[in-house]
A protein has these predicted regions:
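ABC ATPase NBD coupling module
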Residues: 88-103, 210, 244-252, 364-365
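Catalytic Walker B motif of ABC-type/P-loop ATPase nucleotide-binding domains
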Residues: 296-299
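Helix-to-loop junction immediately C-terminal to a conserved catalytic motif
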Residues: 71
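Conserved signature/switch motifs of ABC ATPase nucleotide-binding domains
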Residues: 270, 291, 323
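Conserved ABC transporter NBD signature motif
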Residues: 79-90, 134, 138
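Conserved ABC ATPase signature
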Residues: 271-275, 279
Length: 380
């Protein structure tokens, strides 16, 4: 993914500095294909707590697809995405629960035109709050029954779990040894192909299938290992809210606080069709913030705005950045990327071909494709 020794050292230095913080998102060998078209090509990277990672690059390079995979709006063909240690591809992981901690802001706002601004912001918190309250009450009802079962059979079950885990780890290591050889042969078949004016990487289809099958088998074994955890006694946990009325009141109070923050408190009862593009995007950001996310994903948040409205949206994102929010931002605004980003990723042909801190990325690019891109966009 990184093309030469200097770039590899720079990437390693970026990750070494970030490793002092907690990894929020871990991307391992992420591949995405649409039919025979390879859009994301074996991407691996980490997003750390508090980072503002800005992704730039030519159109068709896979930036938006990568962002959509992070929130599982697109299913990866192969590879893993871990969010706070949870594998998002694992069927046993509740994706909707994980998404509550990953805010997403789209190019086209995606507001509900038949709801007021306030209801757009409160819709998800109220719905999820009621669902969580009900689920917790049901769980609490079964705690005494479960604990009786644990006292009788817990030790035997945990011993069986340990034996199964050891066997799965052994099988996974054997598959990794085979994958290493197949990957080496697969890389030798790489070719560049022009489609509709864009360059894509292609590989031998049979080796690609073999590589993906092996990767999927390894992922399945590793997911199974991650679930081989000892059982233990459970405790009754009180729900955060005790009634629907309490949930709705809390959500509306939070919505008004967010609207006041973005200067649109007076628009609480207005409908999206009456708002400007800049106002809609600020409300879309407030809606994402209403879930108190750990990470915010921005997919070209200003691309659908008139030029005079871009500034108000970028200013709001800058405020969030200054407060320490972890962010991943796809943008064509190079000045904004330089000012806000703590790390810049350059994507081309489905790969991260360069990454660095903003100053060195813009002043001392290493990759030829990066240099060409910056010449075009900065001199435009």
């Amino acid at each position: 993914m990184i093309n030469n020794e200097n770039e590899s050292l720079i990437a390693a230095e970026c990750h070494a500095q970030a490793d002092e913080k907690k990894a929020m998102l871990e991307v391992e060998n992420l591949t995405k294909k649409f039919g025979d078209l390879l859009v994301l090509d074996d991407i691996s990277t980490k997003i750390y707590e508090g980072e503002k990672v800005v992704i730039v690059g030519p159109s068709g390079g896979g930036k938006s697809t990568f962002l959509r995979c992070l929130n599982v709006l697109e299913d990866p063909t192969a590879g893993r995405i871990l969010f706070m240690g949870n594998d998002l591809a694992d069927l046993k992981v509740n994706i909707n629960v994980q998404r509550q901690n990953i805010g997403m802001v789209f190019q086209q706002f995606n507001l509900f035109n038949n709801y007021t601004v306030k209801k757009n912001i409160t819709l998800a918190p109220v719905g999820i709050g009621i669902s969580n309250m009900r689920k917790q009450k049901i769980k609490n009802a079964f705690v005494p029954i479960y604990n009786k079962f644990y006292k009788k059979y817990g030790d035997k079950i945990n011993a069986k779990i340990d034996a199964e885990k050891e066997q799965l780890i052994k099988q996974s290591e054997e598959l990794k040894a085979v994958l290493k050889d197949v990957s080496a042969e697969w890389e030798k078949t790489k070719k560049s192909e022009e489609r509709q004016g864009k360059t894509y990487a292609t590989y031998d289809p049979e080796l690609t299938k073999k590589k993906l099958k092996l990767t999927a088998k390894i992922e399945k074994k590793e997911r199974a290992v991650s679930h081989k955890n000892h059982i233990a006694e459970k405790q009754v946990v009180a729900p955060e809210f005790s009634s629907k009325k309490e949930i709705k009141a809390h959500a509306e109070e939070n919505a008004m606080r967010l609207l006041k923050r973005i200067g649109l408190e007076q628009k609480a009862d207005a409908y999206p069709s009456t708002l400007s593009g800049g106002q809609k995007q600020r409300i879309a950001i407030a809606r994402a913030l209403a879930m108190n996310p750990k990470v915010m994903l921005f997919d070209e948040p200003t691309s659908a705005l008139d030029p005079e409205m871009v500034g108000e949206v970028l200013d709001l994102i800058k405020e969030l950045a200054e407060e320490g929010m972890t962010m991943v931002i796809v943008t064509h605004e190079m000045g904004f990327a330089k000012e806000v980003g703590t790390r810049i990723l350059f994507m081309s042909e489905g790969k991260i071909t360069e990454e660095n801190n903003p100053k060195d990325f813009f002043e001392h690019p290493q990759n030829d494709r990066t240099k060409e891109f910056l010449r075009k966009v900065l001199n435009a």
